[in-house]
Design a protein with these regions (language model features):
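Core solenoid repeat modules with strong leucine/isoleucine-rich periodicity
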Residues: 72, 85, 109-141, 146-152, ...
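Extracellular "leader-to-stem" segments immediately downstream of a signal peptide or signal-anchor
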Residues: 1, 17, 40-42, 46-64, ...
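Extracellular beta-strand solenoids
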Residues: 8, 21, 30, 44, ...
Length: 320
């Protein structure tokens, strides 16, 4: 447990793997990451401290009350091509926060896969995204009573795509522009509207609403709603208060497509490892100078000889 779990200051290639934490303030915070970073198999919840058995550990009710009033699970400012997979956040004021660097307009783009958030005030809070956008797939965002599964702040003006995502709770957008798209998504429980789009643009493709009413609310500044085979049994209910929105609803079997597969195993159970700790360095002929210089010598026979030497020594690693 910690006040802050992991903080990435301006840098590149951070890698947070197989981590379980209770952070009272922020679980993971990313600033100005200028090359691909990864968050994989991370759990952020008040229960880890509460159930740790450590001296002075609080009750689950007490620590959850604090994190739900103050905490953020995963906070991503500018990051260029962040990859997040198998992230679970529960019991925080904000589950996942995406937005700008403080005092600047720099924002992230990222791919999120198997991100699951529940019991948070805002499951996902999007302040802003850079022009390359955010893709979120095979994930879920669940809100408590009176909370939002997803919220888009007024600075949002680019692109977020949800594919194969389950929502419990409303999605609310006050973004000034931009496109929010939903493909093969499911909208379960929500109070009045599943989608309350006060401004901006929304696209729906083959989405399933579990209630017969309250699907989409369009505010005065909504520009576009386009829907294909979406709604309750493919019937979409729209409450249109826009001044001039372009609304198009299409249904038909010819527009049906295969949804993104679920429960895909993205990692092998046992990673390969060398038979021994032996390491052999092979210093082979190679190109010199800039990357566009071509090598002139065939080293395949020497490379095979080096591999054979490693094998004869009982296995190991060949370092080039």
């Amino acid at each position: 447990n910690a006040y802050n779990g992991f903080n990435s200051a301006p840098s590149e290639l951070h890698y947070v793997l197989d981590s379980y934490m209770t952070a009272l303030n922020k679980g993971i915070e990313v600033h100005v990451c200028t090359d691909i970073a990864r968050i994989e198999n991370v759990r952020i919840s008040p229960e880890y401290w509460a159930k740790s058995g450590l001296p002075g550990a609080p009750s689950l009710a007490d620590v959850t009350a604090y994190t739900k009033a103050n905490g953020t699970g995963y906070q991503m400012h500018r990051s260029d091509w962040e990859y997040v997979s198998d992230l679970l956040v529960s019991g925080y004021k904000t589950g996942v926060w995406i937005g700008r660097e403080p005092g600047f307009a720099d924002a992230p783009n990222a791919q999120l896969y198997e991100v699951h958030v529940d019991g948070c005030g805002n499951g996902l809070y999007v302040e802003d995204v850079n022009p390359y956008g955010i893709l979120i797939s095979n994930s879920s965002f669940a809100a408590g009573e009176g909370d939002n599964a997803v919220y888009f702040y007024k600075d949002f003006s680019t692109s977020v795509q949800f594919n194969g995502v389950d929502f419990n709770g409303p999605i609310v957008s006050d973004g000034r522009d931009g496109v929010i798209s939903f493909e093969s998504c499911t909208f379960n429980e929500y109070p009045d509207y599943a989608l309350k789009i006060n401004s901006g643009n929304v696209l729906l493709s083959q989405c399933d609403f579990k209630k017969s009413t309250g699907h989409v609310y369009l505010g005065a500044d909504t520009y576009t709603l386009k829907s294909v085979n979406s709604g309750y049994k493919s019937k979409l209910q729209i409450d249109n208060h826009s001044t001039a929105a372009d609304v198009e609803v299409i249904t038909g079997k010819k527009y049906t497509f295969a949804p993104i597969p679920k429960n895909i195993k993205t990692n092998i159970a046992v990673h390969p490892k060398p038979a021994s700790d032996n390491v052999l360095k092979a210093d082979l002929a190679r190109a010199t100078g800039y990357n566009n210089n071509r090598p002139t010598r065939d080293v395949s026979a020497e490379l095979q000889s080096a591999l054979d030497a490693v094998k004869a020594a009982g296995g190991g690693t060949l370092y080039l």
